[in-house]
Amino acid sequence: MGLKRFKPVTPGRRFMVISDFSDITKTEPEKSLLAPLKKTGGRNHHGRVTVRHRGGGHKRRYRIIDFKRYDKAGIPAKVLAIEYDPNRSARIALLLYADGEKRYILAPKGVNVGDTLMSGPDAEIRPGNALPLEKIPVGTLVHNVEFTPGKGGQIARAAGTYCQIMAKEGNYALLRMPSGELRKVHIKCYATVGVVGNEDHKNEVHGKAGRVRWLGRRPHVRGVAMNPVDHPHGGGEGRGKGHHPTSPWGLPTKGYKTRRGKRPSDKFIVRRRNEV
């Protein structure tokens, strides 16, 4: 996969950098692995905005991804295609298992069409294979890591991300998260060996506001440009905030810690990300 740059024939093209999609081998998705996807516009079931700056965008269909893989332990799978997924930054790989079933997984870096992948405790340590953490050597880079055994991968699923196994002690493995946090994870949790593909995603530049709107994101308006009824920074003569910077709901921002204390998972965090 590479990046594509453009000549500045228009203002929107001047700084635009996008993927050349050279790693995509199949343009139409597998119909049996599609599901309808309803837009929320950032609203919850009460109809209230819970995520600002969301709405519009191109229509999408959800690709059903296998984040668990342990139920296919010992069954080899051949990579049929590498596909684009509009719902995530990573590419997805279409697998055909020896028993005839097709499934999507996150496409790891270095996995190509025709490769054979495996999951289970006895799988080989190579990119794309899924194993319990107890079977993966210390120092290995992994992605799609489970937090709870059997729940499916939740950590390191975005393009170019990974966790590193730092140590093992008792029933827990010590993992360095993409954020830099050191955290204990149960050794029975599954993880996929390797790094998530499409690493150049972080270097893409949209070039114009319209491309961002296609992705379903609306303009991010500054608080000082609003009226007092809409934001604590609103109103006044000129552009002054008048007080310490706050969020739209009045909480201090720029350094104020908002993480809820005494969470049950605190005992698994060895070192917080901001202590690195």
Curated annotation (Swiss-Prot):
Extent of Basic and acidic residues compositional bias: 230-240, 263-276
GO molecular function: RNA binding; rRNA binding; structural constituent of ribosome; transferase activity
Keyword tags: Ribonucleoprotein, Ribosomal protein, RNA-binding, rRNA-binding
PROSITE patterns in the cross-refs: RIBOSOMAL_L2 (PS00467)
Region (Disordered): 223-276
GO biological process: cytoplasmic translation
SUPFAM superfamilies associated with the record: Nucleic acid-binding proteins (SSF50249), Translation proteins SH3-like domain (SSF50104)
GO cellular component: large ribosomal subunit
One Pfam family recorded for the sequence: Ribosomal_L2_C
Main function: One of the primary rRNA binding proteins. Required for association of the 30S and 50S subunits to form the 70S ribosome, for tRNA binding and peptide bond formation. It has been suggested to have peptidyltransferase activity; this is somewhat controversial. Makes several contacts with the 16S rRNA in the 70S ribosome.
Family as reported in the entry's similarity comment: Belongs to the universal ribosomal protein uL2 family.
Quaternary structure (record): Part of the 50S ribosomal subunit. Forms a bridge to the 30S subunit in the 70S ribosome.
Protein name as annotated: Large ribosomal subunit protein uL2
Gene: rplB
